[in-house]
Amino acid sequence: MQERHTEQDYRALLIADTPIIDVRAPIEFEQGAMPAAINLPLMNNDERAAVGICYKQQGSDAALALGHKLVAGEIRQQRMDAWRAACLQNPHGILCCARGGQRSHIVQRWLHDAGIDYPLVEGGYKALRQTAIQATIELSQKPIVLIGGCTGCGKTLLVQQQPNGVDLEGLARHRGSAFGRTLQPQLSQASFENLLAAEMLKTDARQNLRLWVLEDESRMIGSNHLPECLRERMTQATIAVVEDPFEIRLERLNEEYFLRMHHDFTHAYGDEQGWQEYCEYLHHGLSAIKRRLGLQRYNELAARLDAALTTQLTTGSTDGHLAWLVPLLEEYYDPMYRYQLEKKAEKVVFRGEWAEVAEWVKAQ
């Protein structure tokens, strides 16, 4: 059974999105996993904890014996069935545990006894994690062009359309503002970093690129933060600023935050609960910046939001949202972004409307 254990092998796994059958306990998987991994644990959280205590108190032989006792009979058969099905569904996949130790070797041996030869990651998740960290450090050294602009300028779409673009907000499952959450929960920090590394590796392998095109992000995107190596390089990067007309920005924001989010919530939860979730999402976003708006202004905008939601519910029209969105942009988001941009004005190398910036970026 051929094992993979070189740095290039690990990178190749990430670039190819090789399916990984991760046999660590769910708690370990939730703390950090590779993008193409599925969690089919040898031991659940309680079993792993019991074996860990036994190991500390009685040593490795006793812990191993306890593990075999806990994962036996019907439990073992159920897990074998799941591993067998996953192997057949992913014939070019690979097994992985924490460090390429006993857990992945035990599962590999059991599968072999059942007639399935399946490789494993020699260094386990730890080796893949170190590969992801190192790849991000190395690839971050390439030049970066940042796409800046006020809310609603279509920065994310512009980045997505570049062959050398990496959509940081898409990877983080958050659009980076008080209203930025999506219906997908954010990943753990380690899983986000692993996903980012894999995306950078794949993009670089496709393009052999000279520079990255990224959105001008702050350090935090929701609950995830950018790796320090990348964030440091972004602070040194040149910036192209999208300056679209206010009306165009409003159209984009209406589509993204009202029409699309309402559709997504109702698609996920059904009409009634979806509407409630959508309303709560908008109110939560406004509430998140209550302190910065001031109580009086917040109450005024919240009342306008309620009125807009009533209109949307009864007529289907989202036009009423302009009554609170326009002042929110004019009084809060636009001044905040312009202030931030002023502090790095010397890094701005191009300004223009969306199509002009897109054309300029392609020429770089």
UniProtKB/Swiss-Prot annotation:
SMART domains: RHOD. It catalyses: 5-methylaminomethyl-2-thiouridine(34) in tRNA + selenophosphate + (2E)-geranyl diphosphate + H2O + H(+) = 5-methylaminomethyl-2-selenouridine(34) in tRNA + (2E)-thiogeraniol + phosphate + diphosphate; 5-methylaminomethyl-2-thiouridine(34) in tRNA + (2E)-geranyl diphosphate = 5-methylaminomethyl-S-(2E)-geranyl-thiouridine(34) in tRNA + diphosphate; 5-methylaminomethyl-S-(2E)-geranyl-thiouridine(34) in tRNA + selenophosphate + H(+) = 5-methylaminomethyl-2-(Se-phospho)selenouridine(34) in tRNA + (2E)-thiogeraniol; 5-methylaminomethyl-2-(Se-phospho)selenouridine(34) in tRNA + H2O = 5-methylaminomethyl-2-selenouridine(34) in tRNA + phosphate. The active site is at C97. The keyword Zinc does not apply. It comes from the Bacteria. One of its GO terms (molecular function) is tRNA 2-selenouridine synthase activity. The keyword Calcium does not apply. Its EC number is 2.9.1.3. Residues 14-137 form the Rhodanese domain. PROSITE patterns: RHODANESE_3. InterPro entries: Rhodanese-like_dom, Rhodanese-like_dom_sf, SelU. Keywords: Selenium, Transferase. One of its GO terms (biological process) is tRNA wobble uridine modification. Involved in the post-transcriptional modification of the uridine at the wobble position (U34) of tRNA(Lys), tRNA(Glu) and tRNA(Gln). Catalyzes the conversion of 2-thiouridine (S2U-RNA) to 2-selenouridine (Se2U-RNA). Acts in a two-step process involving geranylation of 2-thiouridine (S2U) to S-geranyl-2-thiouridine (geS2U) and subsequent selenation of the latter derivative to 2-selenouridine (Se2U) in the tRNA chain. Monomer. NCBIfam families: PRK11784.1-1, PRK11784.1-3, tRNA_sel_U_synt. Belongs to the SelU family. This is tRNA 2-selenouridine synthase. It comes from Escherichia coli O1:K1 / APEC. The lineage of its organism: Bacteria, Pseudomonadati, Pseudomonadota, Gammaproteobacteria, Enterobacterales.
